[in-house]
């Protein structure tokens, strides 16, 4: 056995030397040098100071500007809300525990951090699925003339939270569990043990199939179809230039958000899958810590991409930050608003 299993923890180190200690009661400096824990704490601090303001700013700006409250933007606000929850209830725990070198908040703090990290990550993933399907319906028009309404957007948001809860809640009630992972200062579902009491194997198979493979496959299918349709429409000049431009802008923005999410989560999911399918294989706590902490950047990627690529939101954000006097002026925001509205109600050619 290449690891040590205890009450509510699994450490990827044999206890033959007697070094292993509970991550809830003792510093874990035998897993890595103290400076590496401080480096993780600094990394989490950066995610907090960038992630919290930009996610909250997204919510505030959308609340202040009525023209941003379009059906397409509902799901983007949902992403920002999920990111805010991750920062407040997850990142702060990881920051503090990395700073002190162990899971100082105990099993309850571990469960809280693991739950909110899983919940936020799943809301983000399923929000991107809803975005992909919405773009597919509007641009590829498989349903003919279709207008994406506020009711559709709210149903999409409800769907994202239902799916996220169906993944994050079971470990709270005995189907799997949340354990410290990596250098034992952040937490996630139990991929490591075969404890029959928690039915970990069935949960991990369910999670990978229903909450990773299916949504990622859906995203790739819809965007593959979407890219082909946009290229064909541009070649045939089937739609107005402003509509084509707006479709390209929105599509580029959402594709980058998807790539950002995959960039953050695929390394973690891949490493967790390797651990699950190679039970007993040796791996270091530091090797697991890197993808586990890197996955948390997804809470920062999406709002940054949204701010950089959405001219309408950028104009409204500057308007808010400069107390009602946007340096870009009103002409650009008006033209962008018109094009975005046009995209949401495109009829078949």
Curated annotation (Swiss-Prot):
Q: Biological process GO annotation list?
A: cellular response to light stimulus; G protein-coupled receptor signaling pathway; phototransduction; visual perception
Q: Keyword Membrane: yes or no?
A: yes
N6-(retinylidene)lysine: modified positions: 296
Q: Which UniProt keywords apply?
A: Chromophore, Disulfide bond, G-protein coupled receptor, Glycoprotein, Membrane, Phosphoprotein, Photoreceptor protein, Receptor, Retinal protein, Sensory transduction, Transducer, Transmembrane, Transmembrane helix, Vision
Q: Which residues are glycosylated?
A: 2, 15, 200
Q: In which tissues is it expressed?
A: Retinal double cone accessory photoreceptor cell outer segments.
Any single GO CC term annotated in Swiss-Prot or TrEMBL for this entry: plasma membrane
Region entry Disordered, spans: 328-349
**Protein purpose:** Visual pigments are the light-absorbing molecules that mediate vision. They consist of an apoprotein, opsin, covalently linked to cis-retinal.
Q: What is this protein called?
A: Green-sensitive opsin-1
Q: What organism, scientifically named, is this protein from?
A: Danio rerio (Zebrafish)
Q: Its gene?
A: opn1mw1
């Amino acid at each position: 056995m290449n690891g040590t299993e205890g009450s509510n923890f699994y450490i990827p180190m044999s206890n033959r030397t007697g070094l292993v200690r509970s991550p809830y009661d003792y510093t874990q400096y035998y897993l890595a040098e103290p400076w590496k824990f401080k480096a993780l704490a600094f990394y989490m601090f950066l995610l907090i100071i960038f992630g919290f303001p930009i996610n909250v700013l997204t919510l505030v700006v959308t609340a202040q500007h009525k023209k941003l409250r379009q059906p397409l933007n509902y799901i983007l606000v949902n992403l920002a809300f999920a990111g805010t929850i991750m920062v407040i209830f997850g990142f702060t725990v990881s920051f503090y525990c990395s700073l002190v070198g162990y899971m100082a908040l105990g099993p309850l703090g571990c469960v809280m951090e693991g739950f909110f990290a899983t919940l936020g990550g799943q809301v983000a993933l399923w929000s991107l699925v809803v975005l992909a399907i919405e773009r597919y319906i509007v641009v590829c028009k498989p349903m003919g003339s279709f207008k994406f309404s506020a009711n559709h957007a709210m149903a999409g948001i409800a769907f994202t939270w239902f799916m996220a809860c169906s993944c994050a809640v079971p470990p709270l009630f005995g189907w799997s569990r949340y354990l410290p992972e990596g250098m034992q200062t952040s937490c996630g579902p139990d991929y490591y043990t075969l404890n029959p009491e928690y039915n970990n194997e069935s949960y991990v198979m369910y999670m990978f199939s229903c909450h990773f493979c299916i949504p990622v496959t859906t995203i790739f299918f819809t965007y593959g179809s979407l890219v082909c349709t946009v290229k064909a429409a541009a070649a045939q000049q089937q739609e107005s230039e402003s509509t084509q431009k707006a479709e390209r802008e929105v599509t580029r923005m959402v594709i980058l958000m998807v790539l950002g999410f995959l960039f953050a989560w695929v390394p973690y999911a891949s490493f967790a899958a390797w651990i699950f399918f190679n039970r007993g294989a040796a791996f270091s706590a530091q090797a697991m810590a890197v993808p586990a902490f890197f996955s948390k950047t997804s809470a920062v990627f999406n709002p940054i991409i949204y701010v950089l690529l959405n001219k309408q939101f950028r104009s409204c954000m500057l308007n808010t930050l400069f107390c009602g006097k946007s340096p870009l002026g009103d002409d650009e925001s008006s033209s962008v608003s018109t094009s975005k509205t046009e995209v949401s109600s495109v009829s078949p050619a």
